[in-house]
Structures are given as C-alpha cells and as structure tokens.
Amino acid sequence: MAEGTVLQVIGPIVDVQFPDNKKLPDINNALKVQRIDGSELTIEVSIDLGDSVVRTIAMDSTDGLTRGMKVLDTGAPIEVPVGEATLGRVFNVLGEPVDGGDPIPNSVDRHPIHRSAPKYDELATSTEVLETGIKVIDLLEPYLRGGKTGLFGGAGVGKTVLIQELIHNIAQGHNGISVFTGVGERTREGNDMYYEMKASGVLKNTAMVYGQMNEPPGARMRVGLTGLTMAEDFRDQEGKDVLLFIDNIFRFTQAGSEVSALLGRIPSAVGYQPTLATEMGQLQERITSTKKGSVTSIQAVYVPADDYTDPAPATTFAHLDATTNLERSLTQQGIYPAVDPLESTSSALTPDIVGEDHYEVATQVQHFLQRYKELQDIISILGMDELSDEEKTIVNRARRIQFFLSQPFSVAEQFTGVPGQYVPVEDTVRGFKEILDGKHDDLPEEAFRNVGTIEQAVEKAKKLES
C-alpha cells in the first residue's frame, strides 16, 4: 500500500503528498490518516492535483491534523458491512456502529459504497400498488412497490412526520427489510426514531444509517451511498423486497455543493455544484428494482424557500415515479398531512393499475378541487351568493373533500392526543365516492376534519350536533 503525508488541511479538505515513484491512489479510494493518539481518520480521494498530490474529503472532523502526518492508501473505496448483521443497528457513514452495541465482526461481508447501477437487462418493473393507509396518498398519488417517491416541501410543513408515519404504516405491515438513511437532518429526530422503532418492534428488521447536520460535508455526501449499499445487498444477495427511506435527499445535494466549493470547482446556477445532475443520477440510478428483488424508495426532499424551480428539487423530480407535494397554505388551515392534491402526481394513477372505480373517484375528486380553486377568487370578492346552485354544490362538496383528505397520524398521537388511523384503500375510495355522490351534504364540514373512515365522520357529526 502506498504511504503519503499530509501536505495541507483546509477545513474538511486534506491534500496528501505521495512519493514520486509510487502509484497514486485511485479516485474515490479511502485513505487512513494516523493521528498522534493512535486513532485513524478516513479521507476519500476526490482530485489528482498533479505532482503526486491528491486532494481528499474528510469523513470526520480534521481537528488535530498537522502537516507531515502519515497517510495510508487502503487500495479500495470505503467499505461497509452488509447482510443480516446490520439489522437492528445504527451506523455512521463508514459502517461503524454508533448505537453503543458490539462492534461488527470482521467475518461479516463488506461492500464498497461506490458501485455501478444495475445493467438494463437486470431491471424489473412492477405495477403493484403499495398501500400506505394514508388517504390522500392512496387515492390521488398511489405509490408503486419497487418505485421511487419524493415527499417535497419547505421548512416545517411535515415531511419528516409523513415519512415517520409511512415507516410506521408500511414497515410494520411489511415483512421485508427496511433501511433508514438520515442525511444531514436533526440528531434529535434520529434519536427519537431509533427509540420509537425499538419500542414498536420494527427495529429488528431495520438497518439505520445516520450522517447528521453536525457532521462534515464529506460524511453527509456519502452517507446516502452507505445506506443504499446495505439495501442493495438485501436485494441482490438475499432476493428481498427492501424499503429504503431517505431523509433528506436535499442535504445530499447541499453537502455536494459545500464539497464542490471547497475543492475549488466553479459553481453553476444558484451556487450549486456543476456536477449536480451527475451526482444525483449516480445515486438515484442505483435505487431500482431488479429481477432478484425490489427496492421501494421514499425520499424526503426539502424545497428551499418553497421554490420548486430551485435546481436541487428540480433535478430530483426527474427520477421519481410519484411525488407528494406538501403545501404551506394547507398547514395554515390546519389540514394535516398538508399534501397538495392537485400538484402531487403518480405514474400509477391509471385504470390499468388502480382499477376503473378508483381512477374515476380520484379524477372526480381532482375535478371538484380544481373547480373550487377556480371559484375562490369569485367567492373572496363577491361572496357565495353570486354562485349558481351547481357551483355552490361543487364548493360545499370540495370543502368536505379537502377536510376528509386529512387524518390523524399514529406518530403524532403523543402531541395531539388523537389516535392514529390506518385507512385501507377500499374504505378510502368508498368514502370519497359517497361525498361526491352527495350522501353527506347534510353533515357539517367540521365533521370531516381529522378523521379516518367516512363512518368516523358520520359519528363525529352526531357528537357535534349533540
């Protein structure tokens, strides 16, 4: 193995000098810096600067590094443990356990985090819908098993709560394996999620990988690949159906932007790295289903300043089968989950996949909500009295639909005191069909807010009247 020395340290960037007569390490190779206290720092090769110098990104703090320290080339990219040994554990970007448990034995298989995407002839597509128990998702933007879904939203509109509810609903009803990857998010949320999953019994079928907000950009940029490598092994070696949760894919882009600037690359639009589309493609193309098994991916996507044209969310859009857009104006109306039913999309919402009845009800719901949106200007200026009888009916039913798209979440029960509701897709379709048909025009609008099934809305109406 080649041995070099630290030439200079600029924050998380470390330049390493190798002897002229030695082969330089390859791009993406992991190098180990020997610290004075005997510990090792892992750094990853990014650029060959010439004159036997390589520029690297540190995966941990570079505090205490000095010029002249020894650096060893491992001869391979970062390798992380895979397989059954990862279940029930929490790892960092290097695949080291951070949950206080036993170290992973050396006998456990390890795979490099940098790998090629599956070949075209290995891919498989599915038309099976994944039931989530969340009405607005199951009705209007159904998720495909083996598909990729994005939860888009600005700050504080409920992306993490929604992804936690999806983990609660799908992971508990799903007998397969789940991999949760926390990319640049709050450590407190990761800690809470670990203990909640432990208490609910889901943890034993879950591997968790965290690279949180306080970590250097190198760790945040690579932690997504660590989680994905673990998910790929369950898919390829064991033929499992894997659920891959990523919170938050924007932080992956953000970390890449930080690293790009530190490496001296000229930024592109809005200050992002010029390699944004390439980096996103390399990650997203590996999240796919093959003939051996499937990876169903649900990714939270932060939208900076609620601007969907920002290059980071705009680049992510292109890779997804379904999008769930969270809207701030709905949170202001107290409608949770604050999913925008008109902006959210899914390639699975076709009669061939969801069935004629479901498709008919979903398109009618969207039609009513769209008409209501168009009539809102007239209502705000002239009032309801200026509408025709038909328009008044549309508005009244659309408001009931809007409230009925909300529901209480199990993961929010400790804050709201309202038990969470899992609503089967048949009950969801039936409930909205009854509202569209006018069966519940006599019930107060408030009865439809924050309930599960249509029967619960009827029950709530009786309580409101009494």
From Swiss-Prot:
GO molecular function per UniProt: ATP binding; ATP hydrolysis activity; proton-transporting ATP synthase activity, rotational mechanism
Keywords: ATP synthesis, ATP-binding, Cell membrane, CF(1), Hydrogen ion transport, Ion transport, Membrane, Nucleotide-binding, Translocase, Transport
Span of the signal peptide: none
Enzymatic reactions: ATP + H2O + 4 H(+)(in) = ADP + phosphate + 5 H(+)(out)
A Gene Ontology term for the protein's cellular component: plasma membrane
UniProt-listed Enzyme Commission number(s): 7.1.2.2
PROSITE patterns in the record: ATPASE_ALPHA_BETA (PS00152)
Major localization class: membrane
Record PANTHER family: ATP SYNTHASE, ATP SYNTHASE SUBUNIT BETA, MITOCHONDRIAL
Record's subunit section: F-type ATPases have 2 components, CF(1) - the catalytic core - and CF(0) - the membrane proton channel. CF(1) has five subunits: alpha(3), beta(3), gamma(1), delta(1), epsilon(1). CF(0) has three main subunits: a(1), b(2) and c(9-12). The alpha and beta chains form an alternating ring which encloses part of the gamma chain. CF(1) is attached to CF(0) by a central stalk formed by the gamma and epsilon chains, while a peripheral stalk is formed by the delta and b chains.
Protein name as annotated: ATP synthase subunit beta
Source organism: Oenococcus oeni (strain ATCC BAA-331 / PSU-1)
Organism taxonomic ancestry: Bacteria, Bacillati, Bacillota, Bacilli, Lactobacillales
